Amino acid sequence: MGCVSMTLGIDEAGRGCLAGSLFVAGVVCNEKIALEFLKMGLKDSKKLSPKKRFFLEDKIKTHGEVGFFVVKKSANEIDHLGLGACLKLAIEEIVENGCSLANEIKIDGNTAFGLNKRYPNIQTIIKGDETIAQIAMASVLAKASKDREMLELHALFKEYGWDKNCGYGTKQHIEAINKLGATPFHRHSFTLKNRILNPKLLEVEQRLV
């Protein structure tokens, strides 16, 4: 087993949302296992139906030869630390936990946040979720986690359409924020920066009990 090349792929979901958490996931496996998932219909998670994403998420998490990590950064953390800092911290946590399992580390996007100085085997790949199976697998875990969170929050705040828009700034979502104000799960740094709401919190704490 020592000579089998293992790749750690990393991707995120929820980066550009107005509401909910950022999820960053990492998946470690060899090329043979990656091929198994490609045969199951694995591709960039944005091109998969929610049903297929949840199916693949279960297969990834229950496969005996796949290592995985999922890190969540809440809207509150994003407001206090900034999106870039949260993304870096989450990627750093995954790399620190997964680096001993992998020969190569591949991150979707164009920045390694300076971590390649400490981990020279890091490679950044733009649209990596379309070309690297392990990044696509990480993309599935991150997006399924984000979908699940927003479906749960939708049960508390149906007016914002989170079951459909997943927290992104759609016309309906922005109109709901303008009309009703923000919830405790909105990223106030995002919504205020975009000047789409009054700085008032919705009186909804009783719904959280």
Curated annotation (Swiss-Prot):
A divalent metal cation binds at residues 11-12, 108. The keyword Hydrolase applies. GO terms for cellular component: cytoplasm; ribonuclease H2 complex. SUPFAM superfamilies: Ribonuclease H-like. Its EC number is 3.1.26.4. InterPro entries: RNase_HII, RNase_HII/HIII, RNase_HII/HIII_dom, RNaseH-like_sf, RNaseH_sf. It comes from the Bacteria. The keyword Manganese applies. Keywords: Cytoplasm, Endonuclease, Hydrolase, Manganese, Metal-binding, Nuclease. Residues 5-202 form the RNase H type-2 domain. It holds the Pfam family RNase_HII. GO terms for biological process: DNA replication, removal of RNA primer; mismatch repair. Its main location: cytoplasm. Gene3D superfamilies: Ribonuclease H-like superfamily/Ribonuclease H (3.30.420.10). Endonuclease that specifically degrades the RNA of RNA-DNA hybrids. Belongs to the RNase HII family. This is Ribonuclease HII.
